[in-house]
């Protein structure tokens, strides 16, 4: 939410939450009056949990069950939010497909917000290999179509009392 507030995203903006499944971003966006929200996740179970939690509010959200590594958007979004889906892509082709999807799926001047495990973060997530990033490595991947506006490193404390270091970057499409 900090990046969405930082970028002063208008309430009518088209927002997609990639890997949003059962996260609470959609709850916060709805509570703040955002009107055009899409949640994409590979897990139908996670999406069903979010729908159940939201009750009737779930009808205000577009839900997409898809693998982001092969996703081709049929529309353009003003905000593409991804907290920790991108780092699950470990193959060059998957990473390039994702970057191509952002280029195609985000409006000019649109916003790309990505959070991944940093280079100091865990090397696996839920026992699955991931790709770690730094602010510079994310910038290098996105530089052809996006300008970095803000990056921060954040220590996230898990329910298991461990700390995971993330890098969050906000980009504008150029």
Where are these predicted regions, by residue range?
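Short, conserved loop/helix-junction motifs that constitute active-site signature segments
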Residues: 104-107
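A conserved beta-strand element that flanks and buttresses the S-adenosyl-L-methionine
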Residues: 81
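Class I (Rossmann-like) S-adenosyl-L-methionine-dependent methyltransferase catalytic domain
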Residues: 1-75, 89-101, 111-174
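Short catalytic micro-motifs in class I SAM-dependent methyltransferases
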Residues: 84-88
